Swiss-Prot record:
Any single Gene Ontology cellular-component annotation: extracellular space
Keyword Cytoplasm: no
UniProt-listed SUPFAM superfamilies: 4-helical cytokines
Protein name (record): Prolactin-2C5
GO molecular function, one term: hormone activity
Signal sequence, renumbered to the chain: 1-29
Length: 222
């Protein structure tokens, strides 16, 4: 029997993932759901297969965005300052790595991913908006950031639906680096910090969802 937490809303995540049109060229030919009592039930295995694949692809794209941004603005003073920057998600009680995540119950692991995704809802909007106003920013950076935002939103909406039976929504607070400044270098460093945090956080989400995929699909050696 499937876990009660997952069954009712798993079809929402799959629809959102499919609509993101990532990786799946022939998905239209696949059965989208099984009808039962006039309701649509998604195939459980497909949900986690797609979620894991999409999250991994997003993680790669965020890392590429970070590298491109760092390379383009490498001459900005203080960009690579080694002093630690506190990300707005650092207070969240989530596993830091794959080893920790392996020892977490799947419900708690899904909740960890949900908390990170929810915490990035407003910052993602801000990041894309801010990047478009920075002087001489390459179009490819804006395009990638916009595409990443859409794909992350798809995963976020699906995971939120899965978590809807748990605690109510927590307030999303703006990160400390939500700043309004006329100093171009300061704005570039702020955006760089945001992308760095997003890169780190989505590596975690990728780990969580793929551990869940392996757990639910009984895949060895993940």
């Amino acid at each position: 029997m499937l876990p009660s937490l997952i069954q009712p809303c798993s079809w929402i995540l799959l629809l959102l993932l499919v609509n993101s049109s990532l990786l799946w060229k022939n998905v239209a030919s696949l059965p989208m759901c099984a009808m039962r009592n006039d309701r649509c039930f998604m195939f459980f295995e497909d949900t986690f297969e797609l979620a894991g694949s999409l999250s991994h692809n997003i993680s790669i794209e965020v890392s590429e965005l970070f590298t491109e941004f760092e390379k383009h603005y490498s001459n900005v003073p203080g960009l690579r300052d080694k002093s630690p920057m506190r990300c707005h998600t650092s207070f969240l009680p989530t596993p830091e790595n794959k080893e920790q995540a392996r020892h977490i119950r799947y419900e708690a692991l899904l909740k960890s991913g949900d908390m990170i995704l929810d915490a990035w809802e407003n910052p993602l909007d801000y990041l894309v908006s801010e990047l478009s106003t920075i002087k001489n920013v390459p179009d490819i950076i804006i395009s990638k950031a916009t595409d990443i935002k859409k794909k992350i939103n798809a995963v976020q909406n699906g995971v939120n639906a899965l978590m809807s039976t748990m605690n109510g929504d927590e307030e999303n607070k703006n990160p400390a680096w939500f700043l309004q400044s006329d100093n171009e270098d300061a704005r570039i460093r702020s955006s760089y910090g945001m992308i760095s945090c997003l890169d780190n956080d989505f590596k975690k989400v990728d780990i969580y969802l793929n551990i869940l995929k392996c757990y639910m699909l009984k895949i060895d050696n993940c």
